[in-house]
Structures are given as structure tokens and as C-alpha cells.
Amino acid sequence: MGLARALRRLSGALEPGNSRAGDEEEAGAGLCRNGWAPGPVAGSRRRGRFVKKDGHCNVRFVNLGGQGARYLSDLFTTCVDVRWRWMCLLFSCSFLASWLLFGLTFWLIASLHGDLAAPPPPAPCFSQVASFLAAFLFALETQTSIGYGVRSVTEECPAAVAAVVLQCIAGCVLDAFVVGAVMAKMAKPKKRNETLVFSENAVVALRDHRLCLMWRVGNLRRSHLVEAHVRAQLLQPRVTPEGEYIPLDHQDVDVGFDGGTDRIFLVSPITIVHEIDSASPLYELGRAELARADFELVVILEGMVEATAMTTQCRSSYLPGELLWGHRFEPVLFQRGSQYEVDYRHFHRTYEVPGTPVCSAKELDERAEQASHSPKSSFPGSLTAFCYENELALSCCQEEDEEEDTKEGTSAETPERAASPQALTPTLALTLPP
């Protein structure tokens, strides 16, 4: 009975028009050119973050065989990675175990020599050590070099001398391990990430006539991040042409590696730009498709801490709902007199750019190609359009001029000052066609 049922299933699977093959064809037809689905599968819930906004990875390891032995084999890294309370507890227990072990050793040596008898011998191994508590105190005083001057070792027992020498060596090794682990934990560049910030949202807007994905990074400290560079990856489930389902596929997002623009000089906040071209995983996504997409953009900032020369890595992520289509970041860098000023009040702020195309970059390229072959090509922008950055630059310039006029007691404004905006923002109000 069971064999017949299995044969029927096998024959049905070998038929050329079986339903499974049709399902695979339908699934393959719904994929983009890179094998990625344009949106979440119908009926499936949106997946959680793989990398949280604070940079922690939302990953939990289970069913690890021999996890404790593997961690103990790299004890120093384990001590550096654990929390401070567990680290202090571990080191306290280590010192206490060392004192107890050598205290027990000294007590056994004294007991075997007869120092604990009622009438003590005339030449004991340890002076003033007549109990286990006294032996424990002697071990404590020896390892910590307290030196009260009451208890001491004599030359009567070579074993006692050897035990004292061994404890001194073990104490030095333990002290070096503890000091090294504490210093390594204090100097970890992990805390440096607290002063490296990403913008809360990423934006999609036109830059140099191309749709670009942009986000902002900033350094809150005066100390620089040496050899700072950025990279990004797009995480999304993918189905291969062979039907293999990859739950979390990683694809690099180009942020200027070939041109060297991924290397940044992070003195003031910088906007990272990813040009959405034919090699971009976002090439076929418009505003509507982006809202329905199911992916996660992981952004990474790496560099060396100037004070310690240790490499640090700061991470964050953006979901499709955190990608603002048709927005730009407000400027944050201004010039005040002879100095430059960074106003972090505008760091996360964006403003909407009217006229941003809602189609995908692929459709935009196709339209541009058709317009190039057309005898009448209209310029998409308005010649009377004025940039928000220019307005903010001029307003800041006027505020600075008013402050200087108030200090100097003059109400007249010189033409040179009125014509020079003091904000480091794009000052071209018009964008001429190529």
C-alpha cells in the first residue's frame, strides 16, 4: 500500500506538466533581473532587522557543540568580551582561589613537618603559622607583597621555599593577565562608536541628473578617525534561477570604491552617495516599489581611533520605510567669521524636493535616452527654481551680518558682505543643461 502510494507520487513528479514546475516558473517570472523579488511574498510578515539602529546584530546562536570549551580555549578574548560585573567576579574568584590553593599548600607543608603540633618544633618551616587561617594569611601577604613582618618562611624546609617561589611567579602571571585584560577592555574602540552617528533616515533624490541614495555620517569628537571609509550592503531574500531560496542574501552597494570616494575625511558630517545605476540593486525600484520592498540596507563606517590606533567599526541599518524618496538633507556646515561651525540641529533633518521623479532609475535612463534622440528636448528643471540650501545660506548670512552690525553699532551693510553667503552649501540657484 505504501509502496504503491510512493510510486504514484514519483510518477506524478516526473510528468512534464506537473504543478510544481509551473509554480517554479511563476516564481521565476516574478523575480527581478538579479533574482530578487520586488516585494515581500504575499501573506508573509515583514522580517525584523538584521542589524539594529545602534549597530548591534540581531543574531542568536543556538545548538553550539562544545561552546564552553571553545570560549575557554581563548580565555583572554572571553574576559575582554564579557561584561564588567562578570569580569570583576571572575578575577576576584581567581585571586581568592590562588590564595586558598597556596594557603592549603603551606598548611600541608607545615602539617607534614610537625609545625602544627602542640609543642612546635624549634625550627619550623613557617614562623607564626600554626593554623590554616594563618597559612591563608601568609599566602595572601606573600602574593600581594604586604609584608607585615610577623609571618615568614624559614630555610628549614626546601619545599616551603619552592612553594613561596612558585606563588610569586603565579601571582605575577595572574597580575599581568588581569591588568592586560582590564586595559584591553578599557581601551576597546567599542565606546568610540557612541560618538559616531548616522542619520535617522536615508534619502533618494537627484544629484548631477542621477537618482542617488544618500545618508549622512558624523563624528561628535574633535579627535579624528584615521583612514575612515564606508561601505554598505543590501540584505534581502533571493531565489536563484535553480529555485534555491537564500533567506538573507548580501549584495554590495557601491559608494565610490573605484573612485576612492568611499575614503572620507570625517571632520564635519559627510553625506555618503550611492548612485543608482544599472549595477545597483535599486535600479528597478521606483517610489511605489520601494514602499513595498522587503530589504535592509546595512551601512558600515570603519577607521582607526586616533588616540589608540585601534580599528573601530560603527554600524546602522535602514529599512524601506526609512528611505525618504524626494528628500535632501539640510546643510549643517556654516562659516562664522574665521571659523567653521557644525550645527547638529540640522543633522537628521530633511526637506522635500519638488519635481523629483517617482519612477525607477531604469525608467529614468530610458526616458533620457528617448529624449536625447528627440529633436526637441525640454529641460526638466525650472529656470526660476531656487535651492533650499541657498535660502538657508543667505538667511544665515543675514543673521551674521545683523550680529556684526549690532556689535559695531552700524546699520549700513557693505555690498561685499551682502553678496558673500557664509554657509558651505551649494550656491548655484540654477542648473544649466549639459
Swiss-Prot record:
Compositional bias ranges of the Low complexity kind: 418-434
Intramembrane region(s): 132-148
One annotated Gene Ontology cellular component of this protein: monoatomic ion channel complex
Topological domain spans for side Extracellular: 109-131, 149-157
One Pfam assignment: IRK
Cited SUPFAM superfamilies: E set domains, Voltage-gated potassium channels
Transmembrane segment boundaries: 82-108, 158-185
Modified residues (S-nitrosocysteine): 79
Residues in compartment: Cytoplasmic: 1-81, 186-434
Family according to the record: Belongs to the inward rectifier-type potassium channel (TC 1.A.2.1) family. KCNJ14 subfamily.
Cross-referenced PANTHER family: ATP-SENSITIVE INWARD RECTIFIER POTASSIUM CHANNEL 14, INWARD RECTIFIER POTASSIUM CHANNEL
Name used for this protein in its record: ATP-sensitive inward rectifier potassium channel 14
Gene: Kcnj14
